[in-house]
Each structure stands twice: as structure tokens, then as C-alpha cells.
Amino acid sequence: LLKMYSIVEVGSFSYPKPTKEVNEDFLLLPTYDLESNIIFAIADGVGSSSSANKASECAINAISRTLRTKKFSVESALNDAKTAIDELTSLDEKYSDSATTLTIVQIQEKNVVIGHIGDCRAYVKKQNKLLQLTKDHTRYQELLDEGELSVRKLHQHRERLSSILTKALTKSYKLDFDIVNIPIENLIEDGVLAMSLMSDGAYNHWQKRAKFSATTMN
């Protein structure tokens, strides 16, 4: 099939936090599904080091298999990742508490579809700013949406409340995810769609000043 869009440039980085022995992030770098849509994803493991690392790897591997074997949809990929996590949990007791966040992007001809569970984020770069396209599944965001506490009051406890996930990919809970569907024309700038996926370790830096300059990445 003729590819509708070309992948011009890809960059990625990931490293464990100082308090972690292993890296709990896994990435699916941009690639094409069987219908020439562009797919990429990020997963950030939750919980103990061994199960967190394995859970995020398992979720990304499940998406990779889905890409190669059948018509891809974000919903089917999320369901396949959930099945893979459930199987991992059943196979080995040491992975019984396996859980991960998962954010998947599918760039179609006319739309960008994002499937989202947890607190990783999808951004688009427009006018030298990063615009957040997903909403965190955290206690902080939940309280913010409820509007019963002031933003100032919530901000005092932001770090603690942001670490409490309200949704994750795990056998312990029913699959529950957000689907974001955005016309691609709303995201493209000067003929380019510039998107980023980030786990909390990365976006905690950007949210302080989500703007690019000529020296941002120096």
C-alpha cells in the first residue's frame, strides 16, 4: 500500500530514575501497520521493579504482534495488551502484581487516534509549544476535574496525588481506557506533524515551561 505519510525524524531516550534499579519504560518507535498508518506507543511499568519492567515490555510486545498479524485498531491493541498482561500474571507468581500504563498513537489519513491508560502523555508541538492531548489518570487530575478544592490547595499535594494512578493495565481491574480522536488538520503545522510521547520522568521537566527555543535541546 502507498504510505500516506512519511516518518521524517524519530528520537527517543529512556533511563531509570536514581531510586530505580531497572528502567520501567518501554517504547514502540514509529512504524507502519498493515494499512500504512503510523503507530507508536509508550508503556511505563507500575509497582515492584521486576513486575513493572516485565509488564511494560509485555504490553509493547503485544502491540508489536498485533501490528504484524491483523488489521490494527487502537482498541484491539489495548485489548491484546490486556490479554498479554493477564497471561503474564497467570504464568508466574512473581508477576502477580504486574501493571503498566500504556499510551498508543495511530496516525491515519485524516485523524490521529490515541488510546490511553495511566499517566504517560501524548503531546503535539505547535507554535514552539507542547500541547497535551491526553488527560492523566491520577488522583490529582481526578480532584482537579471535580473542582471541589482550589488549584492552589491541590498544587501543595501535587507530587503525592500525581503518583496515585486511577487507571492502569493490570489483571486486577477491568480494562478501562480513553480514546482521543483528533482531525489531523488540527495538529499539522507547516506540513509537519510533530508528536511526542512521554512518561512522568520526562514531562515533569516540560510542564514547568512547555515551550521550545533554539537552545532547548542543547
Stretches found by the model and what they are:
Residues 1-218:
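PP2C/PPM-type serine/threonine phosphatase catalytic domain
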